[in-house]
């Protein structure tokens, strides 16, 4: 009886605290603002929200009740150990002085290079593109590729004697990241700084990993031990996102305060239909069950790259057991007539943005459109949490575990086998591929296999350049406009840590276009019998094997030794194939 009274008192006090904070936000104009036009889908969403409220979903989320996602007792502890992101903003606010000191001490560097993949790199990349670097703070570079030309490009941009390298990996064992470390450690020592090489390095990892041990042995200047109960894609508001952000001068305290604001708006005492995170999750989950599983992001130019992070969060969390939500990031906005009935649009705008006529046209045409408005860039803190909650709730609606990634390891294992073959034979195994100049029939055959709800995934194991970006945009637009097929695009191996799980574990509606190029430059990996070029090629072959073993429709196109000409040929082939 006493326990019951204490429980009621605690819940009542939480409710009063939330009401107090919510009323204060209303008076000050703070708090999440969302508008939506769901047309004929509104009743279904309302019913889903009512069901979530009846199931006590908001309270169970914050109580870390694993049965919200799985009834399997074996998964109970595993899921609970992945929900630390719910309270990490408040936890990190206790370290504000640490971030201030880091921002001050980091001014001694001209550049910071973040070495990481997936959840360790995407939030820093968003912050880099959104905020740039404050005057007096170093410039941030994010390296999440094994492409030799890109690695050499970063090396050429920095003064290595004035650079800090952040080695970021939750597991401490990420192949790409450790390869990056080996290369830059060697570069530092080559430049005569062997005695103080460790002063140019910091590590972000879970406690007790092999990376923590390596960092201690090499005398790293900083070692940040992240809370271990947070999965990589949910780690934006932890050290993985905040350390790089603080170094470039982002106001970390205010960004965390915005996240706490959102946490109060999404509190366990806030009903599902008034709860911004639960509401968005209900929309995504319910519409996905009705075939509208392409969450198409349209972002204000001021936060144009926020979708990089959202893409991984949604794809890796929901793409499993043959189910999943396909995030469409970076696809140019088209006229209403080019879209099918498999979309839901989320428009992320900024206060002061002019009306978006393309979005208005989509609403008028009856497409479901959700509009989320940010006050300024620091509202990203709240948006990180809103989308994490929404994705977790969407997972509950789809009845899948939103916190595992059962198929990610598959391509990694295949890559290891390919590398083992290279070590023993001195060459990579062959793969069926077609030159870009002769790819029309293969691409036409691939697109003709598209069923209702299909999407084209462009997987480019190439150097990212303005030319490649323009070519990919042209391919996406042509396919979308002529075939009414949604498109995604990613650079390898980066996308393997993002949408790779969805490709293999999600709905079998994907059409896969793998694009590779011949590397004219290469970089050795110290301590390994293979180079970055060989590693990148092995990763593309490993993923190709994974696709083929699942009998997924895939075409591999080679750009040759002149990527610019190869891209032009590929764009022409696609435009011809969709006529």
Please report, for each region that a protein language model flagged, where it lies by residue.
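Conserved, mostly hydrophobic/aromatic
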Residues: 8
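C-terminal amphipathic alpha-helical interaction region
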Residues: 25-32, 404, 409, 424, ...
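Extended, charge-enriched "interface" segments that sit outside catalytic cores
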Residues: 29-106, 381-383, 394-397, 404-410, ...
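Glycine-rich phosphate-binding loops that contact phosphosugars or nucleotide phosphates
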Residues: 101-270, 344, 348-372
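Anionic-ligand anchoring segments at beta-strand to alpha-helix junctions in alpha/beta enzyme folds, i.e.
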Residues: 110-162, 296-338, 483-490, 494
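Active-site phosphate/pyrophosphate-binding segments
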Residues: 190-344, 377-486, 497
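Structural motif
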Residues: 299-301, 348-352, 459-464, 515-518, ...
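Conserved, well-ordered active-site substructure
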Residues: 496-529
């Amino acid at each position: 009886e006493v326990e019951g009274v204490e429980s009621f008192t605690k819940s009542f006090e939480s409710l009063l605290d939330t009401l107090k904070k919510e009323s204060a936000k209303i008076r000050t104009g703070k708090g999440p603002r969302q508008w939506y036009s769901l047309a004929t889908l509104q009743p279904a969403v309302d019913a889903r929200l009512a069901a979530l409220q009846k199931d006590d979903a908001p309270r169970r989320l914050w109580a870390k009740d694993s049965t919200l996602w799985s009834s399997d007792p074996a998964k109970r502890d595993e899921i609970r150990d992945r929900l630390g992101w719910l309270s990490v903003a408040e936890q990190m606010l206790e370290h504000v002085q640490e971030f201030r000191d880091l921002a001050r001490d980091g001014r001694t560097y001209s550049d910071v290079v973040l070495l990481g993949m997936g959840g360790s790199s995407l939030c820093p990349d968003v912050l880099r593109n959104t905020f740039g670097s404050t005057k007096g703070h170093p410039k941030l570079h994010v390296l999440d590729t094994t492409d030799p030309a890109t690695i050499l490009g970063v090396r050429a941009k920095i003064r290595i004697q004035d650079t800090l390298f952040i080695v970021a990996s939750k597991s401490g064992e990420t192949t790409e990241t450790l390869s990056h470390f080996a290369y830059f450690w060697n570069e530092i020592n080559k430049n005569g700084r062997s005695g103080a090489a460790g002063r140019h390095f910091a590590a972000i990892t879970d406690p007790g990993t092999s990376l923590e041990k390596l960092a201690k042995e090499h005398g790293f200047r900083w070692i940040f031990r992240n809370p271990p109960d947070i999965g990589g894609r949910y780690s934006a508001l932890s050290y993985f996102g905040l350390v790089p952000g603080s170094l470039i001068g982002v106001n970390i305290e205010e960004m965390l305060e915005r996240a706490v604001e959102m946490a109060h708006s999404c509190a366990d005492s806030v009903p599902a239909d008034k709860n911004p995170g639960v509401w968005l999750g209900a929309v995504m989950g319910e519409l996905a069950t009705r075939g509208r599983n392409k969450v198409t992001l349209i972002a204000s130019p001021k936060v144009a790259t926020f979708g990089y992070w959202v893409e991984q969060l949604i794809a890796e969390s929901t793409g499993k057991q043959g189910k999943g939500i396909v995030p469409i990031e970076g696809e140019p906005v088209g006229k209403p007539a080019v879209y099918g009935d498999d979309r839901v649009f989320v428009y992320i705008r900024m206060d002061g943005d002019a009306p978006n006529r393309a979005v208005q046209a989509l609403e008028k045409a009856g497409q479901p459109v959700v509009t989320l408005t940010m006050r300024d860039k620091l509202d990203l803190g709240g948006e990180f949490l809103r989308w994490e909650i929404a994705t977790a709730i969407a997972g509950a609606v789809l009845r899948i575990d939103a916190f595992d990634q059962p198929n990610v390891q598959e391509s990694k294992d295949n890559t290891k086998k390919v590398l083992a073959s290279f070590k023993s034979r001195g060459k990579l195994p062959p793969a069926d591929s077609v030159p870009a100049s002769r790819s029309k029939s293969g691409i036409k055959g691939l697109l003709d296999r598209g069923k209702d709800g299909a999407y084209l995934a462009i997987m480019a194991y190439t150097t990212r350049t303005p030319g490649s970006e323009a070519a990919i945009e042209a391919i996406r637009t042509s396919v979308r406009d002529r075939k009414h097929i949604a498109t995604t695009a990613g650079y390898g191996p980066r996308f393997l840590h993002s949408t790779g799980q969805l490709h293999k574990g999600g709905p079998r509606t994907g059409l896969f276009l793998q694009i590779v190029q011949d590397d004219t430059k290469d970089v050795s990996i110290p301590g390994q019998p293979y180079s970055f070029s060989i590693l990148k090629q092995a990763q593309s072959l490993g993923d190709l094997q994974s696709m083929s073993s699942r009998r997924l429709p895939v075409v591999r196109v080679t750009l040759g030794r002149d990527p610019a000409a190869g891209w032009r040929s590929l764009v022409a082939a696609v435009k011809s194939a969709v006529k």
